[in-house]
Amino acid sequence: MFMGEYSHTLDVKGRLIIPAKFRNQLGEKFIVTRWMEHALRAMPMPVWEKLEQQLNQLPLGKKEARQFKRFVMAGAMEAEIDKQGRIIIPSNLKTYAGLAKNVIVTGSGDSFEIWSDENWQSYTAETAENFDDIAEGLVDFDF
């Protein structure tokens, strides 16, 4: 399971160190794609394959379904970790996520997310402010 919050830096070549605890769970190759709130989502191949199946079952007669599928699939890339524990983030994904030097890597259960420090700080501040309301809105979640 991917969990925790880690602060790292993106080097000038667009390489990002993946936390050691995450590397052990990823396998040889994994997928990184655009995700919600201008973050990137990275996941092991089995998780990607499940998501891919779900995307392929979306009703393509609905514009939103086509948009979501295209956006996620077109933004997806296969990644490998180098000997120094880094991955290369291509420029299109860096631009989408607003990644500069300071990057936050966050665990998200079956996957992890890559955020710009600025976007993450803004997101967590807003979420913290509304956390009780968010929790109460999860009607199917048994605390």
UniProtKB/Swiss-Prot annotation:
**What keywords were assigned to this record?**
Cytoplasm, DNA-binding, Repeat, Transcription, Transcription regulation
Chain coiled-coil ranges: none
GO terms, molecular function: DNA-binding transcription factor activity; transcription cis-regulatory region binding
Q: Which HAMAP family match?
A: MraZ
How is the subunit organization of this protein annotated in UniProt?
Forms oligomers.
Family affiliation = Belongs to the MraZ family.
Its name, as the record gives it, is Transcriptional regulator MraZ
